[in-house]
Amino acid sequence: MGSQEVLGQAARLASSGLLLQVLFRLITFVLNAFILRFLSKEIVGIVNVRLTLLYSTTTFLAREAFRRACLSGGAQRDWSQTLNLLWLTVPLGIFWSSCLGWVWLQLLEVPDPDVVPYYGTGVLFFGLSAVVELLGEPFWVLAQAHMFVKLKVLAESMSVILRSVLTALLVLWLPHWGLYIFSLAQLLYTTVLVLCYAIYLIQLLRSPESAKQLTLPVSRVTQLLPSISRSRAFVNWKEAGLAWSFFKQSFLKQILTEGERYVMTFLNVLNFGDQGVYDIVNNLGSLVARLIFQPVEESFYLFFAKVLEREKDASLQKQDDVAVAAAVLESLLKLALLTGLTMTVFGFAYSQLALDIYGGAMLSSGSGPVLMRCYCLYVLLLAINGVTECFMFAAMSKEEVDRYNFTMLALSSSFLVLSYLLTSWCGSVGFIMANCFNMGIRITQSLSFIHHYFRESPHRPLAGLRLSPVLLGVFILSAGITSVSEAFLCCERGWPARLAHIAVGTICLGVTLGTAFLTETKLIHFLRTQLGRSRLSDKMT
């Protein structure tokens, strides 16, 4: 498969994921706004911070390294060995779920059962849901490696929407069930997710032989299960070694990704109510990251991993592939920069209004608006880091991954210390400040890698981080106008003033986007080309 074809599939995966995710995120956004009206801050804090941390830690430690290792490399591989390796995530998940569940029940502070009932049941069900999701890991990797565009988005959309619907119904009808509600909803989510992948692949294997040859490297359902053969090793030891390197890294990356939740959970720097408010603001602030950056990062990680070879310098690889990879990276960096700047500039002036509409006075009063404004700056760093690390992890050799683990260890340690100190000093805003600091360090590391990678080639993809002076001036002007508008029109002067404030922001946003369209012609050409390819591919499939 050529680099242009892989690029087209990656763009198709990203664009399809983006459009469908916008749809189902809007649905869940409305459902979650409804649910918040019926919950206490304490229950939100327990579910969204502590129990979700149990679930995410279990799944991350059990599968992240296997995902990265098994999605790397070319098409020439023994998929039976790869599937055997992926099935090891299930016993790993049982191990981590059991260990972490004991910690959550025996070592951490147990909430008041009158305020948050059925905490033990919640721990059990969230740990179980993590193991259930790991049962679908071989199917997920197989589908992702072969770029089944609509399957991933459809499965995630259906499972998230069903979880939100069940939560809303139970909160409305049986509010006294407490954590039973969220436990059942989480188990439904993982079950539906696994069934979507399993049913799709099983049906595909039962389709006519010609269709199977064009898609999957297996021909029978039983080949999806673990298998032992005397003629070959149980797993590919090169993949297993790479997975071990990524596992050491993933352990540290998890601390960086969920560091504030670990500090809140283990060091008790915030009460459960404050944890709930922080997490709501965190989820709302990261909405753009989940809608845009995550699909792009996942899809183009696949592109870079397939086009580039890990063990070779750029000068020793096919120069056509290197040129395409450099051009794509430059465009992705520009897209991330523009999206992040837009969020930062307009987020500052519209944070309080957004929180008031979404959650009422519980969010728009107190520390909520300050948290949201700080998070808007963090989104800019998050956008750039997502693209740079996406390329770096796809191009690193095993030895470079091992060396980078030491950097991650230092970052993880500094993040935990910095989070604790800043939170003790300035409250929950300290978490975002610590995240910004560490994200800046990670961006510096990945930019250094990219610069070194392309040093011997004529390509300079880091030019994507430079804006035209005209567009930069429009961003600054928009920031000033919307800040003045907020001071005079928002948010205590009623809905007519609020609507006027929204109108001012809409005009400024339109001018900003129009300027970007006229000045960033290279990015516009890239988007038109790849979106056009994805639409053509959709029509042909």
Curated annotation (Swiss-Prot):
Intrachain disulfide bonds: none
Pathway annotation: Protein modification; protein glycosylation
Keyword Hydrolase: no
GO biological process: dolichol-linked oligosaccharide biosynthetic process; glycolipid translocation; protein N-linked glycosylation
This protein's GO CC annotations: endoplasmic reticulum membrane
Subcellular location: Endoplasmic reticulum membrane
Primary localisation category: endoplasmic reticulum
Coiled coil: none
Residue stretches spanning the membrane: 16-36, 45-62, 85-105, 123-143, 154-176, 187-207, 335-355, 376-396, 414-434, 470-490, 499-519
Keywords: Endoplasmic reticulum, Membrane, Sugar transport, Transmembrane, Transmembrane helix, Transport
Recorded topology in the membrane: Multi-pass membrane protein
Keyword Transmembrane helix: yes
Function: Intramembrane glycolipid transporter that operates in the biosynthetic pathway of dolichol-linked oligosaccharides, the glycan precursors employed in protein asparagine (N)-glycosylation. The sequential addition of sugars to dolichol pyrophosphate produces dolichol-linked oligosaccharides containing fourteen sugars, including two GlcNAcs, nine mannoses and three glucoses. Once assembled, the oligosaccharide is transferred from the lipid to nascent proteins by oligosaccharyltransferases.
PANTHER family linked: ENDOPLASMIC RETICULUM MULTISPAN TRANSMEMBRANE PROTEIN-RELATED (PTHR13117), PROTEIN RFT1 HOMOLOG (PTHR13117:SF5)
Family, per entry: Belongs to the RFT1 family.
Protein name: Man(5)GlcNAc(2)-PP-dolichol translocation protein RFT1
Species per Swiss-Prot/TrEMBL record: Mus musculus (Mouse)
